[in-house]
């Protein structure tokens, strides 16, 4: 299935699940959508936190198409699930933004680690959340983001359990793709990140971690949602964690070496 065909299946309501493993060779994107009055500070926030918030594209005020991401793409309808934040609280999840859209909204598309999972799989590195049919586990850490204006919050990480040799290979592979979070930020000790229990993720689903495996943590594009919560904007929107926008960008085009 091409990205365009996949987006049409989301738009029609035929697909409503997490997007891990979908359209493997193509980049997936996290979304943050907020009023233009705060867009400059949010852009500064992304630039200040590039590991967690690598920008793939930014829309014009009011535009629900971002051409660099896909010619027929509509960010109001092409994501399986959206989080709606009001005054910093998650108030609802919706499957379309058409009724909420405003002409001052600015779209920020942020790289997603689902993008490099295809490369890991091609190298024979098994991914537990895909094996178990679950959403990837994500955790809010104790590490503060670099603040920009009203935007701060804490770093969020995704976790994939890997054997030692696979973890080393994963570092080598993902280092080539800083536009989708790049290399892991930590391997092995959840408490060093302020994570008390791997079995209780803040977002997504818990997965099995075997005795011969290490938890491998990547910076995660859910990080901006902690910033949106802290900023307490009257209205801001993001993707539901794990339910991404699939773009026409190839993963290969994002490699830096």
From Swiss-Prot:
GO molecular function: lyase activity
Keywords annotated in UniProt: Lyase
EC number: 4.2.1.-
Lyase as UniProt keyword: yes
InterPro entries: D-Glu_cyclase, Putative_hydro-lyase, UPF0317
Pfam families given in the database record: D-Glu_cyclase
Enzyme class at the top of the EC tree: lyase
Gene3D superfamilies according to UniProt: PSTPO5379-like, PSTPO5379-like domain
Lyase listed as a keyword: yes
NCBIfam families to which the protein is assigned, alphabetical: PRK05463.1 (NF003969)
Entry's family note: Belongs to the D-glutamate cyclase family.
Name of the featured protein: Putative hydro-lyase Bcep1808_4029
Organism of provenance: Burkholderia vietnamiensis (strain G4 / LMG 22486)
């Amino acid at each position: 299935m091409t990205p365009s065909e996949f987006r049409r299946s989301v738009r029609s309501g035929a697909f409503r699940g997490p997007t891990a493993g979908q359209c493997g060779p193509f980049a997936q994107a996290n979304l943050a959508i907020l009023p233009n009055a705060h867009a400059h500070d949010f852009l500064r926030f992304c630039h200040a936190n590039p590991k967690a918030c690598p920008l793939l594209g930014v829309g014009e005020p009011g535009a629900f198409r971002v051409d660099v991401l896909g010619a027929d793409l509509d960010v109001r309808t092409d994501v399986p699930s959206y989080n709606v934040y009001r005054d910093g609280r998650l108030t609802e999840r919706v499957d379309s933004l058409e009724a909420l859209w405003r002409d001052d909204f600015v779209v920020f598309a942020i790289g997603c680690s689902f993008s490099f999972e295809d490369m890991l799989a091609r190298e024979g590195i098994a991914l537990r959340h895909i094996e178990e049919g679950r959403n990837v586990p994500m955790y809010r850490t104790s590490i503060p983001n670099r603040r920009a204006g009203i935007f701060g919050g804490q770093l969020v990480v995704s976790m994939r359990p890997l054997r030692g040799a696979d973890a080393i290979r994963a570092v080598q592979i993902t280092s080539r793709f800083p536009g989708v979070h790049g290399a892991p930020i930590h391997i092995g000790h959840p408490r060093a990140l302020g994570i008390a229990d791997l079995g209780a993720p803040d977002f997504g689903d818990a997965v099995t971690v075997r005795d011969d495996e290490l938890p491998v943590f990547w910076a995660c594009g859910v990080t901006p949602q902690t910033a949106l919560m802290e900023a307490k904007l009257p209205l801001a929107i993001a993707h539901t964690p794990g339910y991404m926008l699939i773009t026409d960008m190839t993963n290969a085009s994002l490699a830096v070496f």
